[in-house]
């Protein structure tokens, strides 16, 4: 349980509550969560130790054209890590559902509406793309880059979050490598529902012990935080205990409510090169 679970800013969220689905456009459905809740807990100041974004894929995006003919699309959203707020995912789903019976004059109007509303919620300009479904018909399913660290012959008997697994986890050998794990699992901060993800860690610096890194990632298994907060915690813990020269942490979470969230945090990169889904997405 995190220190801010009972924060006042979380009490008004529709997440975890029975809600009515709206079918006509209602931007007020979007709800913001201050990023400061998690960042204060991590003792991060105004100068963030990372850049990056939250990449969302919108698989259930539909509206009516001026003739009343339904349109369907896949949307991609990039929410800057520097924005004061993240967008709460259930409210995002409810907001997108409000497009379903709403007429828009063009696809451009849909995109402009998404940019306007999401930017207002996040507190910073959000990048949005709206694509025809056909664009995704040939999109490959990919694996994460680098070596997978999951197939280790180790015994795990503790599933409580513990950043100390990363203590004394580096050797003197200097290396630049990319590792990934599909064993990332945490729980929703509000509902306790499981969140399933894969995480890619690219770093340059002293070599990180793979067993200790895997034990650390598995320790999120009973941990309650939003996707974005977990990734920022992973980034700051690796920086604290391993002190790499450069670091990028990219997690891709499985889809829920027609949305997947893919937080990306880096010492030097603003966004991932591609938004390509994994097998579980």
Swiss-Prot record:
Keyword Kinase (UniProt): no
EC number from the UniProt entry: 1.7.1.13
Entry binding sites for substrate: 87-89, 227-228
Keyword Cytoplasm: yes
The organism's place on the tree of life at top rank: Bacteria
GO molecular function: preQ1 synthase activity
Active site: 188, 195
Keywords for this protein: Cytoplasm, NADP, Oxidoreductase, Queuosine biosynthesis
Pfam family, one: QueF_N
Protein name per Swiss-Prot or TrEMBL: NADPH-dependent 7-cyano-7-deazaguanine reductase
Organism: Aliivibrio fischeri (strain MJ11)
């Amino acid at each position: 349980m995190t220190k801010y679970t009972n924060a006042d800013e979380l009490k008004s969220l529709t997440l975890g509550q029975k809600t009515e689905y709206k079918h006509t456009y209602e931007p007020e459905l979007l709800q913001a969560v201050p990023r400061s809740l998690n960042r204060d807990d991590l003792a991060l100041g105004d100068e963030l130790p990372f850049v990056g974004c939250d990449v969302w894929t919108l698989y259930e995006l539909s509206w009516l054209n001026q003739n009343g003919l339904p349109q369907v699309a896949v949307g991609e959203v990039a929410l800057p890590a520097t924005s004061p707020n993240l967008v709460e995912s259930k409210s995002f789903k409810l907001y997108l559902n409000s497009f379903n019976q709403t007429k828009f004059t063009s696809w451009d109007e849909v995109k402009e509406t998404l940019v306007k509303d999401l930017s207002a919620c996040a507190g910073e300009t959000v990048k949005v793309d709206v694509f025809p479904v056909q664009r995704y018909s040939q999109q490959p399913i990919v694996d994460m880059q680098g070596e997978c660290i999951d197939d280790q012959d180790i015994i795990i008997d503790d599933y409580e979050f513990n950043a100390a697994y990363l203590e004394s986890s580096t050797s003197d050998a200097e290396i630049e490598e990319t590792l990934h794990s599909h064993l990332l699992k945490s729980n929703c901060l509000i509902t306790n529902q499981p969140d399933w993800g894969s995480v890619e860690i690219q770093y340059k610096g002293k070599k990180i012990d793979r067993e200790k890194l895997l034990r650390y990632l598995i320790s999120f298994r009973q941990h309650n935080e939003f996707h974005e907060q977990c990734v920022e915690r992973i980034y700051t813990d690796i920086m604290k205990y391993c002190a790499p020269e450069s670091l990028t942490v990219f997690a891709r979470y499985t889809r829920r409510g027609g949305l997947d969230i893919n937080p990306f945090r880096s010492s030097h990169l603003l966004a991932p090169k591609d938004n390509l889904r994994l097998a579980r997405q």
